C-alpha cells in the first residue's frame, strides 16, 4: 500500500471528522477526512493560510505562522484571556474538577515559569537517559511475546503497554496499581476534545478525579517514606525556599501521566504505520541504527501524535501581516505546519534521513513538551527494535484512527511478524 492509499471512503463521519469539519467551517477546502486530512490542509495553506472560521476562530496552517505564535508570549494558553469568557454550565461535570491548580500547559508566566523551573529539576535529560536500559528490556520482552505468538497489536501491546509501565516506574506507582492507569489516561485525555457524548464527558471527569485521589494518597505515603522515584523528587524539590503546593503537584503528575502515555502511544502507532506504507524507508532505517534520532523526528513530523494546539492573544497583535484580535482563539494546526512545502522539501514523502526535520509536534516556546526527551527515547527504542527484530513485518488488517481530534492516533495496528 502506498502512502496516499486510504481505503476509508463512504464511512459514516466520526466525531473527529465532525469536529474537524466544524472547526474549518467551510467546504471550499474539500470534505474533511480525518483518516487523510492532508488534502484539506494543503488547500487551506494555499488558499487561506490564515483562515477565520464562522465562529471567529483563526486557524493557521503555515509552519512560519504556527511557530511564530507558539513562540510569542503575547499568545496565552490560558482560557482566562478568552473574550467572551468561557464559563462552564452549572450542570457540566467538569465543574467538579475546578478549584485546584490549572495544568501546566494552560498556565502563563509567572506561574508557568515558577512551576516549570521546579518540575524541570526532577525531569532532567540525564534522568531520562538512565531509563534507556530499562526501556530496551521492556521492549525486548514485548517483542519476545510477539515472536512466540506470530504477531502483535503495535498500539495495544507496544504503544499502550510500554509508556504506562515506564511512567508508572518513573513516578513510583506500585505494580499492582498500574492496570487501572491506562484506562484512566484514555478517558481523561478525551476532555481535550469537544463534541463529547455525556457518557464520554462523565468518564473523563471520573478518570481525572480518580487520578487526583490516587496521587494524593501516594504523596502522603512518599512524605512518610521517600523513595528513588519522581514523586519523591517532586516532593523534595525546592528553589530558593519555594516548593510545589499539593494541588500543583497533583496537577503536574496527572498531566505527566496523560501526556506521556497518550502521545508516546500515538508516536509508536502512527510511526510504525507510516513505515509499513514506506517499505524503502523502513529498510533504510533498519540497516542504519545511526538514523534512530533522525527517523523518530521524521515520524513526529510526518504524522505526529498531537494534531493541534490553541492560543489566545492577550492584546491585539499584528504578526506576519495579520491582525489577531485580543481574546479570540487561534488554533495552530501542527499537523498541517509539519507538511508545509515552504519549510520541508517534498513534505508528503517520508524520509528517515531528512537533514532538517525540526518539527512542531512538541510545540515551541515556553510550552515546549517537558516529556519530549522521554517520548523520543521510547519511540527510538520501540519502533527501531520492532523493525530490526521483524524484517518481514506486515499489516494484518487496515487500521482506523481513534475519534480524538487533538491527539491523533490509531485504534489498533495489528501486524504479523
Language model features by range: what are they?
Residues 1-417:
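Cytochrome P450
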Amino acid at each position: 500500500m502506498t502512502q496516499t492509499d486510504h481505503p476509508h471512503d463512504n464511512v459514516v463521519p466520526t466525531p473527529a471528522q465532525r469536529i474537524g469539519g466544524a472547526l474549518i467551517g467551510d467546504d471550499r477546502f474539500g470534505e474533511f477526512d480525518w483518516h487523510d486530512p492532508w488534502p484539506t490542509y494543503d488547500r487551506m495553506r494555499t488558499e487561506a493560510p490564515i483562515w477565520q472560521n464562522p465562529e471567529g476562530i483563526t486557524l493557521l496552517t503555515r509552519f512560519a505562522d504556527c511557530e511564530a505564535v507558539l513562540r510569542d508570549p503575547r499568545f496565552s494558553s490560558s482560557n482566562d484571556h478568552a473574550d467572551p469568557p468561557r464559563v462552564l454550565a452549572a450542570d457540566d461535570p467538569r465543574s467538579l474538577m475546578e478549584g485546584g491548580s490549572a495544568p501546566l500547559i494552560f498556565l502563563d508566566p509567572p506561574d508557568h515559569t515558577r512551576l516549570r523551573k521546579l518540575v524541570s529539576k526532577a525531569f532532567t535529560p540525564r534522568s531520562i537517559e538512565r531509563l534507556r536500559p530499562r526501556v530496551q528490556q521492556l521492549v525486548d520482552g514485548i517483542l519476545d511475546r510477539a515472536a512466540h505468538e506470530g504477531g502483535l497489536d503495535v498500539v495495544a501491546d507496544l504503544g499502550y503497554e510500554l509508556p504506562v509501565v515506564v511512567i508508572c516506574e518513573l513516578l513510583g506507582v506500585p505494580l499492582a496499581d498500574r492496570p487501572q492507569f491506562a484506562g484512566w489516561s484514555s478517558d481523561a485525555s478525551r476532555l481535550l476534545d469537544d463534541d463529547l457524548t455525556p457518557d464520554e464527558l462523565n468518564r473523563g471527569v471520573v478518570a481525572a478525579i480518580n487520578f487526583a485521589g490516587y496521587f494524593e494518597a501516594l504523596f502522603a505515603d512518599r512524605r512518610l517514606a521517600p523513595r528513588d522515584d519522581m514523586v519523591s523528587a517532586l516532593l523534595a524539590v525546592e528553589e530558593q525556599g519555594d516548593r510545589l503546593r499539593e494541588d500543583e503537584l497533583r496537577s503536574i503528575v496527572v498531566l505527566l501521566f496523560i501526556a506521556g502515555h497518550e502521545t508516546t502511544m500515538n508516536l509508536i502507532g502512527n510511526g510504525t504505520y507510516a513505515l509499513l506504507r514506506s517499505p524503502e524507508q523502513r529498510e533504510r532505517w533498519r540497516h542504519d541504527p545511526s538514523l534512530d534520532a533522525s527517523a523518530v523526528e521524521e515520524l513526529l513530523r510526518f504524522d505526529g501524535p498531537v494534531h493541534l494546539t490553541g492560543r489566545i492573544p492577550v492584546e491585539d497583535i499584528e504578526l506576519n501581516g495579520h491582525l489577531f484580535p485580543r481574546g479570540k482563539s487561534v488554533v495552530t494546526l501542527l499537523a498541517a505546519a509539519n507538511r508545509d512545502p515552504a519549510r520541508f522539501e517534498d513534505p508528503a514523502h517520508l524520509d528517515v534521513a531528512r537533514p532538517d526535520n525540526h518539527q512542531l509536534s512538541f510545540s515551541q516556546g515556553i510550552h515546549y513538551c517537558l516529556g519530549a526527551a522521554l517520548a523520543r527515547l521510547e519511540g527510538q527504542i520501540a519502533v527501531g527494535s520492532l523493525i530490526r527484530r521483524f524484517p518481514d513485518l506486515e499489516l494484518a488488517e487496515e487500521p482506523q484512527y481513534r475519534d480524538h481530534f487533538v491527539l491523533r492516533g490509531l485504534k489498533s495496528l495489528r501486524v504479523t511478524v
